[in-house]
């Protein structure tokens, strides 16, 4: 009898990935972290009703496309890493990573004043180890932030070659 992997590797891979991510979700939402994810979702949807943070607002879609997507690489961050997120927007992937990995610290770089205020509120309310720099990445990179971080990340900000500059 052929294995599912032999017949359709993509279906097998997607099913295995989904199973792994569901397990991850159950693990990271136990106890206090689950409450923080719920609070972040509530803050996100409330703020999104006033100004555009994201088009993804449904609970299940947000869980999969924002939270789980943000957490997919969390085990690649070294312990106690000092991290930077360029173009933080609504806080993905930084906020889910900060909730799930309390050992991480983030500097969030965002150019929109409204989004910076939202991120500052989230950080304060959830007690996260993060700070917000309200500036364009090109400008922030010229100052004391340059080459300071263990890990830098970005999501849906720019083409990779532009971002790497």
Cite the ranges covered by each PLM segment.
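S-adenosylmethionine
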Residues: 103-165
């Amino acid at each position: 009898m052929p294995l599912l992997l032999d017949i359709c590797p993509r279906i097998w891979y997607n099913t295995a990935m989904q199973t792994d991510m569901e397990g991850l979700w159950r693990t990271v939402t136990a106890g206090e972290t689950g409450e923080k994810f719920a609070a972040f979702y509530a803050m996100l949807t409330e703020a999104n009703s006033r100004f555009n943070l994201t088009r993804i607002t449904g609970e299940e879609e947000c869980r999969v496309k924002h939270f789980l997507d943000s957490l997919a690489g969390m085990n690649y961050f070294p312990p106690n890493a000092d991290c930077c997120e360029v173009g933080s927007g609504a806080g993905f992937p930084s906020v889910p990573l900060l909730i799930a990995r309390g050992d991480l610290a983030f500097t969030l770089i965002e150019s929109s004043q409204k989004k910076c205020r939202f991120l500052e509120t989230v950080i304060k309310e959830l007690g996260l180890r993060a700070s917000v720099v309200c500036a364009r990445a090109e400008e922030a990179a010229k100052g004391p932030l340059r080459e300071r971080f263990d890990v830098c990340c970005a999501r849906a900000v720019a083409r990779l070659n532009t971002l790497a500059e």
